[in-house]
């Protein structure tokens, strides 16, 4: 029996969905749809259009459904570091900031006046870059950003898209590691860093690792696409993990 898997692969300039099928000859891959990913510039800031990305994913699922294939599971990967602020009602508070936004220039240096650079690197083990989520969040906090102040949850990009498909909020390990918030030894979010930027573990979804089930497609997505309750599985959500 053939097993078909639906992959969503999103980069900073374009995205695609792919149908991968295991046959007696091995893995066969077919591109379902391909689409651009554009930045939105508003008020000298840069944002991603997550609703447009969702629309393209839904279209890919509809095409796959029309092919009559039975999809075993769905997985999503994206670029790293960017995230969505989610309100208490479960809605997105605004479009996600892009890592290309210049508002984080000088942010690491400002942060290291409070926690030494050596401590941050010792905990996280990743390269210090001004657009890492840690510094994005600290910049938003220092600027009294209204969306962050009102946020009940923060979802990284692949987790936000899986939430739109399933209604389940998770934090996948590989994408979270790009944030410079994950302790490389414990493989969990580092409380000392969260505390410094005014956040807690409760601001993040259930921590999951690649291979774990996130949830099935919501009834709404099933109706729109013509698919059943196909499971969405946590994959290595960072596209270069």
Where are the predicted features?
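N-terminal glycine/serine-rich phosphate-binding loop of ATP-dependent small-molecule kinases
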Residues: 1-94, 122, 216-232
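Gly/Ser/Thr-rich active-site cleft segment
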Residues: 10-12, 121-240
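A generic structural motif
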Residues: 33-36, 99, 111, 176
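Short, charged, surface-exposed secondary-structure boundary motifs
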Residues: 41-44, 106-110, 181-183, 217
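Residue-level signal for inorganic ion chemistry
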Residues: 49, 74, 101, 140, ...
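Acidic/polar active-site rim loop that often engages polyanionic ligands
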Residues: 86-93, 114-124, 137-140
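A charged helix-plus-loop insertion that forms the helical arch/lid used to bind
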Residues: 90-103, 177-181
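Short alpha-helix plus adjacent loop in nuclease-associated cores
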Residues: 97-116
